[in-house]
Amino acid sequence: MSGLRVYSTSVTGSREIKSQQSEVTRILDGKRIQYQLVDISQDNALRDEMRALAGNPKATPPQIVNGDQYCGDYELFVEAVEQNTLQEFLKLA
């Protein structure tokens, strides 16, 4: 797969995950950065793919990937936004 992907889930009981996913997509939309939303709740293979790319068998959404390069999770995303290094974080620069 190519391009920027945000792994998320439409099925979660966690308010924290819902909030984090929402913030990531809101920021990307606000900056007009194109991405594909990948819903891991639809297929266990997608969850396994997300975890393999993250290098963490317990990784939870949101996770951000560009092509086959892992960018990071929510905390790293927010840090990049705060430090004005989002383009580099997303491997777009």
UniProtKB/Swiss-Prot annotation:
Could act as a modulator of glutaredoxin biological activity. May play a role in cytoskeleton organization. Its main location: cytoplasm. The modification N-acetylserine is found at S2. Glycans are attached at T9. Disulfide bonds: none annotated. Residues 2-93 form the Glutaredoxin domain. One of its GO terms (biological process) is cytoskeleton organization. This is SH3 domain-binding glutamic acid-rich-like protein 3. May be glycosylated. Ubiquitous. Expressed in heart, kidney and liver (at protein level). Expressed in brain, lung, spleen and skeletal muscle. The keyword Acetylation applies. The lineage of its organism: Eukaryota, Metazoa, Chordata, Craniata, Vertebrata. Pfam families: SH3BGR. Homodimer. Interacts with MYO1C (via its IQ motifs); the interaction is dependent on calcium and takes place at membrane ruffles. It is found in: Cytoplasm, Cytosol; Cell projection, Ruffle membrane; Nucleus. The gene is SH3BGRL3. The keyword Acetylation applies. Belongs to the SH3BGR family. Keywords: Acetylation, Cell membrane, Cell projection, Cytoplasm, Glycoprotein, Membrane, Nucleus. GO terms for cellular component: cytoplasm; cytosol; extracellular exosome; nuclear body; ruffle membrane.
